Regions:
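A short beta-loop-alpha structural element at the N-terminal edge
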Residues: 16-28
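Helix-loop element at the rim of GNAT/NAT acetyltransferase active sites that forms part
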Residues: 20, 31-48
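Acetyl-CoA-dependent GNAT
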Residues: 37, 49-97, 102-106, 119-120
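Active-site acidic-Proline motif in GNAT/NAT acetyltransferases
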Residues: 103-108, 112, 140-141
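Conserved acetyl-CoA pyrophosphate-binding loop and the N-cap/start of the following alpha-helix
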Residues: 109, 113-121
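Conserved GNAT acetyl-CoA-binding A-motif
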Residues: 119, 126-137
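Conserved beta-strand-loop-alpha-helix junction that forms the acyl-donor binding cleft
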Residues: 136-146
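Conserved acetyl-CoA-binding loop of GNAT-fold acetyltransferases
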Residues: 150-154
Length: 154
C-alpha cells in the first residue's frame, strides 16, 4: 500500500518529508535499521541480526508498497532516512478490525515531534481502513516509548 507523501515542520523548524519507501532506499534502509538497533536495546533485534542484502530489502520494500495488508512510511530529513513506521493489517474476517504498528527513529532526531507525527499518520491510515484496535509491542523499561504510546492513547 502506498502512502501519500507530505511535509511536516518539526519542533526545531526543520522540515521532514513522509513518504513510502522506494526500492532504491534499500541500502540506506539497512543502514538505518542497523543504527537503530545499535542505538537502543528496545528494537526487536540486535545490529548483527540486520543481515538482509540490499536486494532482499529492496524486494521487501517493493512488496510492502504493493501489499493490501501493510503500509510503511519513512521520514526523510535533509535527504536521509531519519525514521520509519509501519502498519500491518489483519486479513482474517475475525481479526480484520485489528492492526499492529511499529516505529523506529534515529536517536539524533528524538524529541522533535517525529514520533508523534508518525503515530498520527498510522492512526489515521488505520481508521481509514476500518481498524478499531491498534496493537504494538512494548519492551519494559522503554520510558520514552511508553510516554509516546500513552500520549497517543495506548
Amino acid at each position: 500500500m502506498l502512502y501519500q507523501s507530505k511535509t511536516i515542520s518539526l519542533k526545531n523548524g526543520t522540515e521532514a518529508y513522509f513518504r513510502s519507501p522506494l526500492a532504491s532506499d534499500a541500502s540506506e534502509m539497512m543502514d538505518f535499521l542497523k543504527t537503530c538497533a545499535f542505538e537502543t536495546p528496545f528494537i526487536l533485534r540486535y545490529p548483527e541480526e540486520c543481515i538482509e542484502t540490499a536486494e532482499q530489502e529492496s524486494n521487501y520494500l517493493e512488496g510492502i508498497n504493493k501489499s493490501e495488508t501493510g503500509i510503511m512510511l519513512v521520514c526523510v530529513i535533509d535527504g536521509k532516512i531519519a525514521g520509519n513506521c509501519q502498519v500491518m493489517f489483519q486479513s482474517r474476517i475475525k481479526t480484520k478490525h485489528r492492526a499492529s504498528v511499529a516505529i523506529g527513529l534515529l536517536q539524533r532526531y528524538w524529541q522533535l515531534g517525529i514520533g508523534t507525527a508518525m503515530f498520527r499518520e498510522m492512526i489515521a491510515i488505520a481508521k481509514n481502513m476500518g481498524v478499531l484496535q491498534l496493537e504494538l509491542d512494548y519492551i519494559e523499561g522503554n520510558v520514552r516509548a511508553k510516554s509516546l504510546y500513552e500520549k497517543m492513547g495506548f
